[in-house]
């Protein structure tokens, strides 16, 4: 078994947790690290893009998970050192018992859809949570034209548009008023940031749909943001095309069902 560790930048506590996990793993398992973990553990590290493993253990928050899913190859087991940590599987106090389950093979691998993103036909990185087209500055409303499967949907004014996967619907899209989609669903949700008209409501489309966002108006500049990680400048006349990717995000899970994650990561936090 080959295990990789990816940790949050400049997090010495994350490195100590990685070290404690390594002490629990069988001695014949191969261990590799990203540069950040290696820096604290006095070992040789790899760029995340070079990491390929049977299990990739991330220690940090959702940002660490998303960065890993974007570049590394292998199912991710996330340990939460951040806030809500919807994409993470474990809290720190659950690590010990979970590692014993990992050693015994008592886990399952789940898959979630990713989004394929193109700018004027040129493909950029896939994303796991959402693609956001946003104005270049806060509170600068812009005009967008939205097409679904080549059919014109609407011209709208807003601060931006979010296209999210089911697993990403609990994140930025949710804060913009979008619905929560179960991760088992195959679809995308289109939601709006500060729309000019309150009558504009989020739209859910099937996963085999293609969503196109055209930057309308004259001399307009916006930013395309993927998973809060990568940014691209788009301008008037440019088209951002979003569809389901042939790639998927893989997670290692000890939970019996997806509903456990919804309950533990979303509902409990809302109720409490």
Curated annotation (Swiss-Prot):
It is an enzyme of class 2 (transferase). It catalyses: NAD(+) + ATP = ADP + NADP(+) + H(+). InterPro entries: ATP-NAD_kinase_N (IPR017438), ATP-NAD_kinase_PpnK-typ_C (IPR017437), NAD/diacylglycerol_kinase_sf (IPR016064), NADK (IPR002504). Its cofactor is a divalent metal cation. SUPFAM superfamilies: NAD kinase/diacylglycerol kinase-like (SSF111331). The active site is at residue 62. It is found in: Cytoplasm. NAD(+) binds at residues 62-63, 67, 129-130, 140, 157, 159, 167, 170-175, 194, 229. Its EC number is 2.7.1.23. Its main location: cytoplasm. Involved in the regulation of the intracellular balance of NAD and NADP, and is a key enzyme in the biosynthesis of NADP. Catalyzes specifically the phosphorylation on 2'-hydroxyl of the adenosine moiety of NAD to yield NADP. This is NAD kinase.
């Amino acid at each position: 078994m080959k295990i990789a560790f990816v940790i949050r930048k400049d997090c010495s506590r994350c490195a100590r947790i990685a070290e404690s996990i390594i002490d629990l793993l069988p001695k014949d398992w191969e261990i590799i690290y990203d540069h950040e973990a290696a820096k604290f553990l006095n070992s040789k590290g790899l760029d995340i893009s070079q990491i390929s493993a049977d299990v990739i253990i991330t220690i940090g928050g959702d940002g660490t998970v998303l960065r890993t899913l974007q570049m590394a190859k292998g199912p991710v087991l996330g340990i939460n050192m951040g806030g809500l940590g919807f994409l993470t599987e474990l809290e720190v106090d659950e690590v010990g018992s979970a590692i014993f389950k990992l050693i015994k093979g008592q886990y399952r691998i789940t898959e979630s859809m990713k989004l394929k993103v193109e700018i004027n036909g040129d493909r950029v990185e896939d994303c796991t949570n959402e693609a956001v087209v946003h104005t270049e500055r806060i509170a600068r409303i812009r005009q967008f034209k939205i097409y679904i499967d080549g059919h014109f949907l609407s011209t709208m004014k807003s601060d931006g548009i979010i296209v999210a996967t089911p697993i990403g619907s609990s994140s930025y899209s949710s804060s913009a008023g979008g619905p929560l989609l179960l991760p088992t669903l195959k679809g995308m949700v289109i939601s709006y940031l500060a729309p000019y008209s309150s009558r504009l409501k989020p739209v859910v489309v099937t996963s085999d749909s293609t969503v196109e966002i055209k930057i309308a108006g004259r001399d307009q500049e916006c930013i395309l943001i993927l998973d809060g990680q990568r940014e691209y400048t788009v301008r008037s006349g440019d088209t951002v095309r979003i569809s389901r990717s042939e790639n998927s995000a893989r997670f290692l899970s000890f939970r019996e069902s997806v509903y456990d994650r919804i309950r533990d990561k979303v509902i409990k936090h809302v109720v409490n």
